[in-house]
Amino acid sequence: MAFLKKSLFLVLFLGLVSLSICEEEKRETEEEENDQEEDDKSEEKRFLGLLPSIVSGAVSLVKKLG
């Protein structure tokens, strides 16, 4: 009977460790996805911030040529 208890505790412990590792990997993956989304948003903001100066430069170039 003691052998069965030890085996059961060992199985439960290993299952708990495995579950903990899976949860940690899942959390890391979610953090990486969030970081990627934030990077994409900041790049979009930078591009949109430059857009007015690009447009005004193009307009002034067209005025000089036309």
Swiss-Prot record:
Residues where Leucine amide is found: L65
Subcellular location: Secreted
Gene Ontology, cellular component aspect: extracellular region
Domain of life: Eukaryota
Residues cleaved off as propeptide: 23-44
Signal peptide: 1-22
A GO biological-process term: defense response
Compositionally biased residues, Acidic residues: 30-41
Alphabetically ordered keywords of this record: Amidation, Amphibian defense peptide, Antimicrobial, Cleavage on pair of basic residues, Secreted, Signal
Keyword Secreted: yes
Database matches in Pfam families: FSAP_sig_propep (PF03032)
Main location: secreted
Keyword Iron: no
Span list, region Disordered: 24-44
Role according to the record: Has antimicrobial activity.
Protein name: Phylloseptin-H9
Native organism: Pithecopus hypochondrialis (Orange-legged leaf frog)
Gene: psn-11
